[in-house]
Amino acid sequence: MSGSQSSGSPGSPGPPGPPGRSALVVYGSETGNAQDVAEEVGALAERLHFTTQISELNHVKPESLRSYTIVVFAVSTTGQGDLPANARTFWRSLLLKKLPPTFLSGVRFTWFGLGDSSYPKFNWAARKLYKRLLQLGADEIYPGGEADHQHSSGLEGTFIPWLAGFRKHLLDKYPLPPGQDPIPDDVQLPPKWVLRLRDQEAASEDVSPPDAMGAAVTGDFPDSYRLDNDHRPLHDSLTATLVQNKRVTPQTHWQDVRHLILTVSDPISYAPGDVLTITPKNTAEDVQSLIEMMGWQEQADQLVSLVPRDSTRSTNELPSPPIHSLDSYPRLTLRELLINYLDIRAIPRRSFFAAIAHYTTYEMHKERLLEFTNPEYLDEFWDYTTRPRRSILEILHEFDTVKIPWQHATSTFPIIRARQFSIASGGELKRTSVGGARFELLIAIVKYRTVIKKIREGVCTKYISNLRPGSTLKIQLQRGGLNSSVGQLVGPTMLIGPGTGVAPLRSMLWEKAAIVKSYQEKNPGVDPPIEPTILVYGGRNRAADFFFEDEWQQLSDLIKLKVLTAFSRDQKQKVYVQDVIRENSSLVFNLLHDKGGAVFVCGSSGRMPQAVRETLTEAFQYGNDAGTQPFSRREAEDYLVGMEKTGRYKQETW
């Protein structure tokens, strides 16, 4: 994300464009991709001289939409076809029964959805928003577009051609007045917010620069520079203490998987399927490297403030800052900003290359950087960035003539985004001995090789892997999309979760165990009214990555748990979870059809959930051994669709 285009509440005008030429770009985003799209659309509109506002949907009142010439919606799908959290208030306001079919008459809009076709409800959020806008009288002025996470070129594969078509539409339908041309791509749009040194008195305060090349985790840094002590004022966050960070795969195993236990003092409630988000930090070494490359040594340890570029605008006209809560950071230096908030190890988007091309005078570098922004070179862009996972820091090392003004850091670098992890604890595992909340996570540390010699590491999991017990870190609790009811927890269920996908399923199993134990305490000697649960687990090797094996044995009798396993590398013929489902098709048919059970699929997106869905369809066709008429292919597919509609088939993949 670039902070340069982010704007505040609709209704606050930006720089004036031609009369009757305004654009509102709104987004619903869970991980930031829809916000990236919104900001790129906003930049396009600004170059076409639209007075442009960008905002998350929850900050918008539906009745304000008609005051803009055009409105663009960028919406991701999360959970079971849901809108992201920062769009749900807006969505609920559109669902009020009292709204007449003319409520949004005069609103001219288009939309772009972001989804993952491995989910049954692909781009569901954007599609249902589109339909509701039409129901309320809004006019679609340009056909919406859809991005698919599974596309070979990622979201860019469909977004770039959609954006090019939208630009042509705007120029055709909203032509510029004579003598006015679009702002060329090689002309920099001014950032909305900039950094500045605090007044001379504050800047002269003793802020001693650390030896940034020392040890990052336990080195002699001020607290705010250390990875293991997190006191950032992040919105809606909790400060958690790390109790355990244990590797649960052998050192010889190809993958480092960690079992984390975190605690907070407050007795916070959560349910199976909920997620924790963790906001990582950059290492002091990486930040020092950037400071030296950019020549920011003089400013690095001085106190800075983030201020609007145009200080003449009134408070209610100010755009929203790219980073929130900085005003509550008591002594913010440029170095602290880089360590705590700016993602210098992200894989950049095309807009980053466009931004840094303005900061070099070396024509060969400028030309090369601009080539990466050209849609005609999309494959080359992917070959340079996404496929080898080349980071911003590495790119700046290679294009060493780029010198970004420190004042523009927040409008050039993306913001560090929180990463989501499914909570693996439930039932009695949710509380500490002193009444606080306890969270368990199962996290695969991202570490791999590409064509680049240096090993690739995930920004967040590298941060997590370096934390030791006793560390504090910022977390946020978010409601998940599985929404398993008590009836489903104690009823017939089939849980499918290879690898770390078992984490949210473990939460469900321990929750079921707590329900059973509570019933037994209240009804001694009476069998609890529960149905069987089948867990289908997959890994590479039973001896290396059969997570929580001892627990499954412990819970088997208590909650009527049956575990089916598929270890792909323990025999010559590879076996996956879908193969185990196929081998047990009669059992599956009985549980899901005859008993009316529910299915929960968790784990990696892509082939696994699609293969599971196909195998379940086959089970409905061939698993009925009761002698009655078997399902046809169409009937089996329809039955599975019916399960989705009634909440009996849910998927949470990543």
Swiss-Prot record:
| Compartments (UniProt record) | Cytoplasm; Mitochondrion
Alphabetical GO biological process terms: cellular response to oxidative stress; iron-sulfur cluster assembly; nitric oxide biosynthetic process; positive regulation of nitric oxide biosynthetic process
Which InterPro entries does the record associate with it?
CysJ-like_FAD-binding, FAD-bd_FR_type, Flavdoxin-like, Flavodoxin/NO_synth, Flavoprot_Pyr_Nucl_cyt_Rdtase, Flavoprotein-like_sf, FNR_nucleotide-bd, NADPH_Cyt_P450_Rdtase_alpha
Q: What one GO molecular function would you report for this record? A: flavin adenine dinucleotide binding
Q: For FAD, which residues are the binding ones?
A: 389, 419-422, 458-461, 654
Compositionally biased tracts (Low complexity): 1-10
Write down any Gene Ontology CC term.
Answer: mitochondrion
Please indicate which superkingdom the organism of origin belongs to. Eukaryota
Question: Domain FAD-binding FR-type spans what residues?
Answer: 235-485
Top enzyme class of this protein? Answer: oxidoreductase
Which prosthetic group or cofactor does it need? FAD; FMN
Annotated binding of FMN, by residue: 29-34, 76-79, 114-123
Region annotation (Disordered) ranges: 1-22
Instruction: Return the similarity comment.
Output: Belongs to the NADPH-dependent diflavin oxidoreductase NDOR1 family. In the N-terminal section; belongs to the flavodoxin family.
Record protein name field: NADPH-dependent diflavin oxidoreductase 1
Record organism: Emericella nidulans (strain FGSC A4 / ATCC 38163 / CBS 112.46 / NRRL 194 / M139) (Aspergillus nidulans)
Q: Name the gene for this chain.
A: tah18
